[in-house]
Amino acid sequence: MRVTSATCALLLALICSVQLGDACLDIDKLLANVVFDVSQDLLKEELARYNPSPLTEESFLNVQQCFANVSVTERFAHSVVIKKILQSNDCIEAAF
């Protein structure tokens, strides 16, 4: 089954929605890592930083699988969606 970029956007929005403080706004860094296909270890480390609870192997694999199934073009396209989410009032208010 192919995962759509919308699904990836929702996953990142979910990660963002559970964040406090700077982590919500810093998700741009995570997004850049995903777009440019960094190593699994680095991606896992970055995801762990944004997750207030220990990142489970299952949750990491879900996110990793999501991004493994979309093209670089799609990753850039949904990055715009995530940036809009990050700039929304809900996300900004969570940072304060």
Curated annotation (Swiss-Prot):
The subcellular localization recorded is: Secreted
InterPro entries of this UniProt entry?
Secretoglobin, Secretoglobin_Domain_sf, Secretoglobin_sf
Query: What are the alphabetically sorted keywords of the record?
Result: Secreted, Signal
Q: Where in the sequence is the signal peptide annotated? A: 1-23
Question: In the UniProt record, which is one GO cellular component term?
Answer: extracellular region
Q: Which family does it belong to?
A: Belongs to the secretoglobin family.
Protein name per its UniProtKB record = Secretoglobin family 2B member 2
Organism (species) = Homo sapiens (Human)
Q: Which gene encodes it?
A: SCGB2B2
